From Swiss-Prot:
Gene: HEMB1
Protein name: Delta-aminolevulinic acid dehydratase 1, chloroplastic
Residue sites binding Mg(2+) per the record: 336
Transmembrane segments: none
Pfam families linked to this entry: ALAD (PF00490)
Protein's job: Catalyzes an early step in the biosynthesis of tetrapyrroles. Binds two molecules of 5-aminolevulinate per subunit, each at a distinct site, and catalyzes their condensation to form porphobilinogen.
Lineage summary: Eukaryota, Viridiplantae, Streptophyta, Embryophyta, Tracheophyta
Pathway given in the UniProt record: Porphyrin-containing compound metabolism; protoporphyrin-IX biosynthesis; coproporphyrinogen-III from 5-aminolevulinate: step 1/4; Porphyrin-containing compound metabolism; chlorophyll biosynthesis
Gene3D superfamilies registered for this protein in UniProt: Aldolase class I
Superkingdom per UniProt: Eukaryota
Compartment(s) of residence: Plastid, Chloroplast
Gene Ontology MF terms in the entry: metal ion binding; porphobilinogen synthase activity
Provenance organism: Arabidopsis thaliana
Tissue and organ expression note: Highly expressed in cotyledons during dark-to-light transition.
Length: 430
């Protein structure tokens, strides 16, 4: 059966499709030629008028030279063109029991029988527009591979990053989020480098906006990349993470990012009250149109390991359980969501993604705001490792995992697979 691809290598705005659409989207009919038999049959023999599929000819049915009225009269008189025979019923394997069919009023498999109907009735779709591409940046000139994340790099902010963004845009991914690896010499206990207007992130934003004005840039608002303690907030001498003082620093960081040209600031710190404080700070500086994507339900997960290696941002002591959410909790996500909504969040994010599909669905059902899901580094690395070891089909599992996040209710997905998945959706492999 011949197929016509709906995507090509140069697509810059590909359509949506399902995870298995390669096999059926855009199919051509396998009936390439149609002809009508010239013989007449007896008037007493009445049969339905059909046309025969032919494998030869020029693809056009042979005309009989009759008017519509003459054709209708011929059929009414029983002079019907020859039709193909009724196809035989496919044979069952030898030994199949002969039974009375089940008396079922509904057989859901009927709607799954054909690739065409499966495509028509598909409830969830996915496209490159749904992806936000997380990119790691550093001060160096070279792109450094991240050992725990095959295929991911710390990109040189002036060269490698620009090239990677160009690749993503070519396949329809026009949203990115930046994560900096900050030199140790610039880190301190209060994370002051986070709001340096000439720091790595603001410089990078200005560079990208100069080259790609329509690129949507999300930024991370948190102190851990800038903190000598590796925590998301200021640490008191007794180990307590100071909430309000941290929020003060985060407000300055968000304003600095907005000043550089960020479109969406994304507080990932999980401090109480930070969304409202950041909203007020942005508005006071004239950045009313800068959006806030709040990490609403960020769990104290074990899936973050590769990310922390990438940024060298592991906490120097303890863990993050006093501010990130308990993985055992469900209802608590509603408390966070309601607070973030009331404080002015524009997007609510759940992190990690696949292990927390129930939380994504909960927020989707309870909130009118757009929902984001973060397919985190651990999720990415597990799929990559399984693919390298030939234990799974990497591409199929990748696409299925992303479709599951969409099905659960995510409007956008932060995923390290963004470029690879979008390339797949465009019908080419990287």
């Amino acid at each position: 059966m011949a197929t016509t691809p709906i995507f090509n290598a140069s697509c810059s705005f590909p359509s949506t499709r399902g995870i298995d659409c390669k096999s059926y989207i855009g199919l051509r009919s396998n009936v390439s030629k149609v002809s009508v038999a010239s013989s007449r049959i007896a008037t007493s023999q009445r049969r339905n008028l059909v046309v025969r599929a032919s494998e030869s000819g020029n693809g056009h049915a042979k005309k009989l030279g009759m008017s519509d009225a003459e054709c209708e009269a011929a059929v009414a008189a029983g002079n019907v063109p020859e039709a193909p025979p009724v196809p035989p019923k496919p044979a069952a394997p030898v030994g199949t029991p002969i039974i009375k069919p089940l008396n079922l009023s509904r057989r859901p498999r009927r709607n799954r029988a054909s690739p065409v109907t499966r495509a028509a009735f598909q409830e969830t779709d996915i496209s490159p527009a749904n992806f936000v591409y997380p990119l790691f940046i550093h001060e160096g000139e070279e792109d450094t591979p991240i050992g725990a994340m095959p295929g991911c790099y710390r990109l040189g902010w002036r060269h490698g990053l620009v090239q990677e963004v160009a690749k993503a845009r070519a396949v329809g991914v026009n949203s990115i989020v930046l994560f900096p690896k900050v030199p140790e010499a610039l880190k301190n206990s209060t994370g002051d480098e986070a709001y340096n207007d000439n720091g790595l992130v603001p410089r990078t934003i200005r560079l990208l906006k100069d080259k790609y004005p329509d690129l949507i840039i999300y930024t991370d608002v948190a102190l851990d990349p800038y903190s000598s303690d590796g925590h998301d907030g200021i640490v008191r001498e007794d180990g307590v993470i100071m909430n309000d003082e941290t929020v003060h620093q985060l407000c300055k960081q968000a304003v600095s990012q907005a000043r550089a040209g960020a479109d969406v600031v994304s507080p990932s710190d999980m401090m109480d009250g930070r969304v409202g404080a950041i909203r007020s700070a942005l508005d006071a500086e004239g950045f009313q149109n800068v959006s806030i994507m709040s990490y609403t339900a960020k769990y104290a997960s074990s899936f973050y390991g590769p990310f922390r290696e990438a940024l060298d941002s592991n906490p120097r002591f303890g863990d993050k359980k006093t501010y990130q959410m308990n993985p055992a909790n469900y209802r608590e996500a509603l408390i966070e969501a309601r607070e973030d909504e009331a404080e002015g969040a524009d997007i609510l994010l759940v992190k990690p993604g696949l292990p927390y599909l129930d939380i994504i669905r909960l927020l989707r059902d309870k909130s009118p705001l757009p929902i984001a899901a973060y397919q985190v580094s651990g999720e990415y690395s597990m799929i990559k490792a399984g693919g390298v070891l030939k234990m799974i089909d990497e591409e199929k599992v990748m696409m299925e995992s992303l479709m599951c996040l969409r099905r659960a209710g995510a409007d956008i997905i932060l995923t390290y697979f963004a470029l690879q998945a979008a390339t797949c959706l465009c019908g080419e492999k990287r």
